[in-house]
Amino acid sequence: MNSATKFFKITNKKQKHYGHKYKKGINILPDKFNLTGSCVKGGFYFTNARNIFNYLEYNGYVGYYVREVYLPISDPEFIMVKDPDNDKSFMIMMNDPPGDKWRANKIILGSKLELSKLDTIKYLIQEGADPIIRNNLLIRWAVKNGYLEIIEYLLDIGANIRDYHNDAFKSTIKSGNNDMLKYLIIKGIDIHFDDNYAIKRAAYYGHYDVVKLLLEKGANIHTNYEEPIRLAAENGHYDVVVLLLNYGCDISAYHNYAIKTAARNGYYNVVLLVAKKLNEQGIRFDDALISACNTGSLSIIKLLIENGADYSYNDYEVFKLACKYGHINIVRYMFILGTDITIKNNYGLRWAARNGHLLVVEYLIEHGANIHAKNNYAIKWAFENDHYDVYTFLKEIQSINEIFEYIKYDRILMNIFYKIVNLTTCIINFDNL
């Protein structure tokens, strides 16, 4: 005989959990039943009507259906335990335990109902489900998923759409659901909540229509040092940046945050737009070069310089960082522009060697860098940091230099050396005939 008590279980759309595919009727655990732990494999989970809305979304498990659950209590092999959500030491076996969540080795599944349907929500509430459990989780879940019928019904029976720090409003902004935002505004939601959280987050996520609606409703674009436009630029949302500029945002706010972060993240079109706006205002943005160099974006470096940034900014900081981080293309570009590669006592070579950037080391030496600078710093630190390819290369160059230094002061050896060079050149030329 089965229990007359009705329990409930929420399943995902595939009705699978821990590898088990749920079906109508009896479901039997194929593996060993787990007597201990919480939210672990080794059992079928279910709850009573009152607590069912606790599990709409649980531990990353997104609910789609709710199933009626009955228990085969007359089966001698049936096992049921209370799952100890908070008290990990409490675990007892029983036939009809108190509590809000249980685990069994066998369950019988009845009707399957879609959670997105208003009739399903009404049915569960009639069965005893608490519609405001967990800080009005049900209405927050309905807002997040755009279930307007369910929202209206819940508001009619007293649910609080602003509960849990306006979570419903926040999730709407995050998802970019413009229709839901319009609905919430009609219902009296405060768009200025939490220092204009809404427009800042909408700009961050690039939700153009949401930002536009909030602007039309009077959101403060200047909040927290022009944070909306700074976040839009930082995340590459070109259209949102243009929109906010049209509403009067200060694009240079917070020490040129917008162009520096857009440059760092490689958003070419945003950088170009902001650079032009800053030029119109006579505002320099040389420091954006540093941001671009940190991530090695040559295209952004070129764009900034072509639009007025000074590549010699802060004692050629871009060149020094490019050497330090191994950005060979930027190093070459800086040299073409006229950078003295020996600046600051051959800083570029010293740090390229220290960090193991062989291509940069080779390029710098080819163009006149001094491997002996600062008491053979490059050689010492290449060895110290186990960059043996760089160390070997530098030692070979050092040996060649020592040979040249030696023969330079010996006339006989110098003459012999030049004869060897001339003879080698003749042989090569003869072979090429």
From Swiss-Prot:
UniProt xrefs under Gene3D superfamilies: Ankyrin repeat-containing domain (1.25.40.20)
Keyword annotations from UniProtKB, A to Z: ANK repeat, Repeat
Presence of the UniProt keyword Repeat in the record: yes
PROSITE patterns: ANK_REP_REGION, ANK_REPEAT
N-terminal signal peptide: none
UniProt-listed InterPro entries: Ankyrin_rpt (IPR002110), Ankyrin_rpt-contain_sf (IPR036770), Multifunctional_ANK_Repeat (IPR051165)
Swiss-Prot/TrEMBL ANK repeat ranges: 104-133, 134-163, 165-193, 194-223, 224-253, 254-283, 284-313, 315-343, 344-373
Pfam families (UniProt xref): Ank, Ank_2
Domain of life: Viruses
Identification of the protein by name: Putative ankyrin repeat protein R267
Organism for this UniProt entry: Acanthamoeba polyphaga mimivirus (APMV)
